[in-house]
């Protein structure tokens, strides 16, 4: 059972909401009271895939002496080394990871997918193993960005000064928690000089593919 983190008092019933994040400063109620005009809008963004030209691909080679090499289209070879060595019980000092030509990533190639499988097969076969996802496997097996539902409320003076702003953002995270909702909260009003603001982010778990990073995960929706 999952209980929402970041809520006070702590919930006593489980739900599909993993976490609540809040950021901001000032007095939004006073800011709205001082406004000449208040505008409220709701927006939705759809789940989209990074759509990189080259699919996920790797070449793994595990030697009898325990040393191993992994050539992989990755944006984060150190995290790949950490995850793969941990999953397979390899000595991290003996695993060398080389980032090959990425072929596009946009955040989607920071995550480990089939690489541990390639290493395990190489260790079993005592031969190098190459693994390349088909385009269908990329869409089925890797993660797109979150879809969102966002409510915005802003107050302003007649001279254009924004007196208060509130954003409530619900991020669809797929079947597992972890949507970087905090980055959305950090982004929502970062470009503006608003003395009274509050951003709330919800990490919502649903029966859909697990999401992955896509160009500053969770931030573009909030910036929009």
Language model: regions and residue ranges:
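Structural alpha/beta core scaffold segments of enzyme domains
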Residues: 1-224
